[in-house]
Swiss-Prot record:
The modification Phosphoserine is found at S103. Gene3D superfamilies: Jelly Rolls. Residues 41-50 have a biased composition (Basic and acidic residues). This is cAMP-dependent protein kinase regulatory subunit. Belongs to the cAMP-dependent kinase regulatory chain family. Pfam families: cNMP_binding (PF00027), RIIa (PF02197). Residues 41-102 are annotated as: Disordered. InterPro entries: cAMP-dep_PK_reg_su-like, cAMP_dep_PK_reg_su, cAMP_dep_PK_reg_su_I/II_a/b, cNMP-bd_CS, cNMP-bd_dom, cNMP-bd_dom_sf, RmlC-like_jellyroll. Residues 64-82 have a biased composition (Polar residues). GO terms for biological process: adenylate cyclase-activating G protein-coupled receptor signaling pathway; cellular response to glucose starvation; cellular response to nitrogen starvation; negative regulation of Ras protein signal transduction; positive regulation of protein export from nucleus; positive regulation of transcription by RNA polymerase II; protein localization to bud neck; regulation of cytoplasmic mRNA processing body assembly. GO terms for cellular component: cAMP-dependent protein kinase complex; chromatin; cytosol; nucleus; plasma membrane. 3',5'-cyclic AMP 2 binds at residues 261-375. Keywords: cAMP, cAMP-binding, Nucleotide-binding, Phosphoprotein, Repeat.
Amino acid sequence: MTLPPAYVDELNLLNREVTTKQPTDILRFCADYFNERLAKREEADDDGPRSKPLGGGFREPGFGSSSRSTDGSLFRSSFADTSSEGPGSASSEPAAPFTRRTSVSAESIAPGAFAGAASGVASNNLSAEQLESLYKSVSHNFLFGNLDEEACRSVLQSLQEKKCDSGEKIITQGDEGDYFYIVESGAVEFIKDGVKVNSSGPGSSFGELALMYNAPRAATVVATQPCVLWSLDRVTFRKILLDGTHQRRSMYDGFLKEVPILSDLGSYERNKLADALTSQVVEPGTAVITEGEAGDAFYLVESGEAEVTKKGESGVVATLKQGDYFGEVALLNDLPRQATVTAKTKLKVATLGKDGFQRLLGPVLDHLKENDPTK
């Protein structure tokens, strides 16, 4: 049997990359390589007619992806096949041994395929008070806790209002799940196999796993008072997060190329580093790190300015701007912080934890040590 020429060409290209880069994690390298190839193809497709239907790429969250988030990954932990619909954790009962697993599935969505999708989603007209209340409701939810400000705003603007009368079924046990709900007012109860297992009111949410998989509902949810709910469907949620993940990786890749100390990193190393970074916004006058404290993170300045001060030295000893870095000394030498860094303007930094610092910055650790100000 003759192999397809396109397949042979792809393998030859991959072999060339592997020979050149000599990666230690071959599986991750191949996954990142094909992700990048697919992303470039999607960008090229945006300039002309698509030759394939929307969503025909690899399965979300990514080819060869692990349980950790790329966007930080989308999801940090593994879950049961059925959703625990709300605080009642209706699926928390131990499953009978050797029972057949309930299958779940999710749409195949290629990163970048929905570029600008968030702007195309119908926007609601939430008041400032409603936005604040809804933000508090979702900020502690495991699916939303790692969203950056822009992605969270897109999610909130995509919520659709749903009003329910007392006694109305909102979801039914066993039905396919496709919506997540936040309770703005009223009360609901959770019923599993005909038995009430819990209830909740304003500020609570339920149906999270519907945003990940079209899994069967684990419980029935009934309004016990007239309710105002805000709902989000799975496809919209995944569009927002996947588009955000793709844009975030592209943004960090461009940013990391401009950081002088990281100039020796190849695209493979930059992609791994970009996936591990998290953004943090610091208000003016707030200390990012404080002299004498233990260090657990490395920082890169994305935007804004910060001032460096040291005990025993008068005034500002240095001003940090976009592309500058700090916090490496404590991680290189297991020392307390050697200076205090305070935001001069609104500051946005990319942070990398100690484990990631040592694991992902191997190629540039020698440069960091050479520039170690404590020597």
